[in-house]
Amino acid sequence: MEDKQQGFATFGGPVILTLVCEVATRALKAVRYQKFNVHRRLRPEGVGGLIDRYLTIPNLQDGELKPIAPLVEALRNERLLDRVNQFNNGQSYLLPMAFPEGSPMHPSYGAGHATVAGACVTILKAFFDHGWQLPLGKDEATGRYIAYEPNADGSGLVEVLLEQPLTVEGELNKVAANISIGRNWAGVHYFTDYIESLRLGEQIAIGILEEQKFTFGENFTMTVPLFDGGARQI
């Protein structure tokens, strides 16, 4: 952003916080439409249930569950079904989930959390210096940047050495990714739900920024880095 004046209702905290809230509500409405009116993708739990019934109730294999036969065969070829069956002591082909109540009742694609995360961090990357580098120390022996990551059991932090410094853009991307991937870990989404919904949220945020620019009296530009490595100037 080229304007160097102190902001309040335009480039200050109130407008940024307001836009983050606004883009979140628009993202939820947009992804809700995709869920119910376009894709209606079955949740992983639902797919797992169909696979379990296919394998445990043989008379369904040539009936109502025949369409999933190619999927079951592909999983057999990768020996995934054997691993799941062994893990469950032969009792079920279902995998454990993080939610005791099971998956949400609405369709899987796109992911609401990922869409909101993609939209909100895009707003933040637009208003802040996304290239700003975090002031990390350097290792004297190698000259690499010192950062930290959790140890194997999550009880503490261990030092890691980085070739490149951490930036605002990179850290915001991590936040969006962690929010989105967390839903995959929980067992309620697929990878494509995550990555494509981040991009959907990004496009919603860019649309709002383009729309909002006409309401500003200042002549300014914003360069927004994109998840695919490109950039968009507003």
Question: What does each model-found stretch correspond to?
Answer:
Residues 1-234:
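Hydrophobic alpha-helical bundle signature of multipass membrane enzymes
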